[in-house]
Regions:
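Post-Walker A helix-loop "phosphate-sensing" segment adjacent to the P-loop in P-loop NTPases
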Residues: 112-125
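Conserved catalytic network of the ASCE P-loop NTPase/AAA+ motor domain
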Residues: 86-89, 115-117, 148-151, 156
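Pre-Walker A (pre-P-loop) alpha-helix and adjacent loop at the N terminus of AAA/AAA+ ATPase modules
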Residues: 57, 62-94
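Interdomain "pre-motor" coupling segment immediately N-terminal to P-loop NTPase/helicase cores
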Residues: 5, 9, 13-65
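Short glycine-rich substrate-engagement loop in P-loop NTPases that contacts/grips substrate
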Residues: 76-82, 91, 122-152
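Walker B catalytic acidic pair
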Residues: 160-161
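Walker A/P-loop nucleotide-binding motif
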Residues: 91-107
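Conserved hydrophobic/aromatic pocket- or pore-lining residues that grip, position, or stack substrates
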Residues: 73, 108, 126
């Protein structure tokens, strides 16, 4: 096992490295297909680890003000038929209109979170924040760079807050 740890580090397989002792013990206890069991479990753990890290990265990148699920709002029925993949892949817009307290922000965050869970890159802006960043970019002559960074996202949420 000592030989494996540096190799796992070198390959950047942090999830495997973390769970190697536990999985080796489990494989020894079960004394089944030995190496096959160990390798299969290590690969499963690494996949789970990378998926989790990717989700956390996309959540940080999105800068959502809070985490809201669509199922947590009474207005969820309004958007339950929306397939966020189709909306994004077909470059469609969704506009949420309603009075104060009608859960527009909650629904927008819920849709953004659903997109993040499906591995899309999302960015949440308040209208004021976006306008400020655009003006700042114009003032310092880096509008093109700013727009290029915005284009990297699959979904942009602009909230009125």
């Amino acid at each position: 096992m000592k030989d494996l740890l540096p190799l796992l580090d070198k390959l950047g397989l942090t999830g495997m490295r973390t769970h190697l002792p536990e999985i080796m013990n489990l494989a020894n206890e079960q004394s089944t297909d030995g190496i096959y069991t160990i390798l299969t479990r290590l690969l499963e753990v690494e996949c789970e680890y990378k998926k989790s890290r990717s989700l956390h990265y996309r959540l940080r990148l999105a800068r959502l003000p809070t985490i809201k699920l669509l199922s947590e709002t009474s207005q969820a029925k309004l958007v339950e038929d929306i397939d966020i993949r189709k909306v994004i892949d077909n470059h469609k817009n969704i506009m949420l209109i309603g009075g104060a307290g009608s859960a527009k922000t909650h629904l927008a965050i819920g849709l953004a979170f659903a997109a993040i869970e499906k591995s899309y890159r999302v960015r949440f802006y308040t209208l004021n924040e976006l306008a400020t960043q655009l003006l700042k970019a114009r003032m310092h002559n880096y509008e093109i760079n700013f727009m290029d960074s915005v284009k990297r996202f699959n979904l942009i949420v602009i909230d009125e807050l």
